[in-house]
């Protein structure tokens, strides 16, 4: 579909439908709903015109009260603001649902990045054999995390699901009823969710979205690429899972919770198999076949509801093979495809559904190993160096009992290691086989985990676990090559890797990397680190797999994911694409079957075409490398100066929503590391950090320093070099376009009032100047007239969303100003700030 046709289609099936169904809100039979619907456009106009005139949010909201209401008391005014927030929250849900419902009509099976498009291109260029060869040794893995950017409670998620279907069918009556339900359903968790609640929220998507979307996508891959000699591996699409296993900074994730989540994953996939088998049996009603399937059905049922009954994936497959044998011999293979599809699901999802990972901070491990050393050796903790402690414990024959340790963290850490064996017995080895170490920047960080496993009674042959270092700060990335070089030459670790098929998984953190080094520097540092790690791995005969810790927005490694992976050069290992997906990105990018299938496809084809279709735009030459490196260093210096500004943390603390993230009850994890009352930059978690800039509509981490770097080289008369780089490098182009997406979601007029602030005025002007510079430089570089010029539909979608939430932003800033001035009821204004967080985050779809 051509761009103009797509834009017109979007106008008809998204914009127009939103206008029509939005009017249904006005007729909902709830308290003052019509009144709110009539007042809201006035608040929007006051905001739009007011900001253009340089008014503050306080002036805008007060003008609105004065001109359009007769409210007098503070209580009456804040009550109206709460009702407006509730109304806008539901408008956002409606727009989400309409846009999601239009997905299939706006995308076709032959779009760029689809399986069919890849097939057509491979056929034309005679690369089909190469594609099949690559498929044999390639996979994508999407790892769902529990990071708190997901603001819809489960009840609302289900309404969204039903609303989307009703919109697809244009069922006005059902839409009206669902909007009524939406009006009465709370959007806010009264209590902070437990890690188990978070896990159940994502398991909902596994059961009702990914079981179908991945199953259907694999069937399509088989149909398109399969031959009598080649069947694509069912492992080509894999799922990972962090809720209940990610302990980093979350004291509520206990060893017991991990066991419960693993069991929920096992039971959930068996429920899907049980339900799916009912449909299979409706077709395969033949003598002999039906008996085998009935027996399987009973065993599945018992495995779901009886604790002492277990069924393995192989057992299910064996029974399906038996049914197939009878089907072929006695019933002409009728409906064999139905049986085949079912068996493929079992091969894909096993009895684990998604692989549960454990993650913990290296500093926690060090304390645990110190504790163990003292207990086992009887020596003082500082009597040996860290390396000496590791060597001592490797020689020890001790088998630890977690209950022998008084320290709760030591006890919990050891229990979680013992539980790995149990989870592998119940869910299969794929149920849990990775231990991720946050903040890895030393060899000991990896060896500490190996030592703990050995002391928990695992023999060398039983350590069926990939130990995964996570390099996430500038310092960690700098050291990563040396760390891996040492590990690859360590006899103990080398032996362990041999048992793991000489495969090393390395995780790289885009979120903390960008927070630490700024957008351009972090992305370039990760790129060059991957190159060095690829080289050192190949030299040591190791197959390296990179696991990218990416968030929703460009400031946390998100943005155009397909373009990012398709732009990786041949100097970076491409054995597998693994990345984290979280919060809003789960609902907005993988939230329904069509979207999920499309986006799984995009990732899969990005990795395959990157290897098969060589392009000079992917590999950087020495001149291009030097140029990106210069730009990255200049931008890093600029960003570092900003971080060192005495007003940096106070600005976030006093002028943004940072302080309120932890109070929103959207995630189980605290919003900052450490328990101290004074906020330090290093204690800030990446999500609240990036999210707070997003709420201010400033998105600083997504562009700051980039424009300054471009201008610096332009002043040296080298802008033509950068233009050549932009045209010649897919990687650099993707970075520029992602940064422009961040800038397109900014709205500095919202905070113009801060420019005259006695304390923060100068700091605000630093931010604004760099935004103006970055925007001007990038438009000049790309020859665009407007940001995101090449993506008219995404730009249109963002514009509508920004229009919906503009009144919400005014309310949030109004409440923040009242709090800064210490005016009115503090508790009420704090609640206004928190409530407005939800709608703003949900509307932007990838803000944190």
How would you describe each model-predicted region?
Residues 2-234, 256-311, 356-359, 764, ...:
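Extended, highly charged
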